[in-house]
Regions:
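Mg2+-dependent phosphoryl-transfer enzymes with acidic/Ser/Thr/Gly-rich catalytic loops
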Residues: 1-4, 21, 189-269
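Asp-based phosphoryl-transfer active-site loop
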Residues: 3-17
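Short, flexible loop segments at the rims of nucleotide/cofactor-binding pockets, characterized by
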Residues: 14-18, 43, 84-85, 229
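Active-site phosphate-binding/coordination module
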Residues: 22-123
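Hydrophobic packing residues within well-ordered alpha-helices of enzyme cores
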Residues: 24, 49-53, 166, 170, ...
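Short active-site oxyanion
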Residues: 35-39, 61-63, 153, 213-214, ...
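Short, structured coil segments at secondary-structure junctions
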Residues: 56, 61, 174-176, 230-231, ...
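Conserved acidic, metal-coordinating active-site core of Asp-based
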Residues: 98, 102-218
Length: 269
């Protein structure tokens, strides 16, 4: 019996127009009415989730969101932090040094800010900020490492070829010290070592006294793999890569074909 539904957002809950299909909203409400807990699990920062959560119309429910690829977990009753992992000043200095050696640009996130290091943000960073409804805040390395901010996650952004080059040159080294993932063609992410959506989901499930076997997780991208494998039932979207599909227990329709609703109807309702 499924007691917790863990949903990725981009490419899963959201269609290609970055909207939540009505079929998904309806199915989620039906699942919650059956007692299933909803946990949105996303690489987005919290401020990139809030407008969508409001659209779901779950104001009277206390659900959870896991953001920044597992770095922070919030309860929706007051949006307070219930669990988090953060980068140390030494971590930030290391990531900054990698960015300085490459053509990508480093960004950092705390609960409220989308920070940019190393000068004016490139066009790709600006586009990403627009997608998560955020202004950009330029910050110096000195201020970023001052301890004033709780920095959850770093992201390197550049063109696809620039990000290819960064990954080829530095991913092997970086992944010895951080949890790194190429989440999008133009983004390489770095979280505190051992941090994934799955680790955050595991800790939350323990708090809620829910077993992994009672969790259904859905996703489409590389940063969803650990979560799909952790859950008792891991569902890949029809728009996922063949590799992600091969690691899932089942494949549903795409995010353009109400894939989330179809899976909820099949396994929960």
């Amino acid at each position: 019996m499924i007691k917790l539904l863990a949903l990725d957002m981009d490419g899963t809950l959201l269609n290609e127009a970055k909207e939540i299909p009505q079929a998904h909203i309806t199915a989620i409400h039906q699942a919650i009415e059956k007692g299933v807990k909803l946990v949105l699990c996303t690489g987005r920062p919290l401020f990139g989730v809030l407008p969508y959560y409001k659209q779901l119309g779950l104001d009277l429910q206390n659900e959870y969101v896991i953001v920044n690829n597992g770095c922070s977990t919030h309860q929706t009753s007051d949006w307070g932090l219930v669990d988090w992992q953060e980068l140390s000043p030494a971590d930030i200095e290391y990531l900054y040094d990698l960015a300085e050696k490459s053509d990508v640009q480093l960004t950092l996130f705390d609960e409220e800010h989308y920070f940019v290091l190393g000068g004016k943000p490139n066009e790709i960073i600006q586009n990403d900020a627009d997608l998560v409804f955020s202004d950009l805040t330029e910050i110096s390395l000195e201020e970023a490492t001052s301890g004033k901010y709780r920095m959850f996650q770093g992201m390197f952004l550049g063109t696809e070829s620039q990000t290819d080059d960064f990954e080829k040159r530095f991913a092997g080294e970086l992944c010895k010290l951080f949890s790194g993932v190429r989440s999008q063609p133009v983004i390489y992410e770095a979280m505190p070592l051992g941090t994934t959506k799955a680790t955050a989901l595991s800790r939350l499930a323990e708090i809620l006294n829910i077993e992994a076997s009672e969790i259904m997780a859905m996703g489409d991208a590389n940063n969803d793999i650990e979560m799909l494998q952790f859950a008792g039932l891991g569902i890949a979207m029809g728009n996922a890569s063949d590799y992600v599909k091969s690691l899932a227990d089942d494949v549903t329709a795409s995010n353009e074909e109400d894939g989330v609703a179809r899976a909820i109807e099949k396994y929960i309702l």
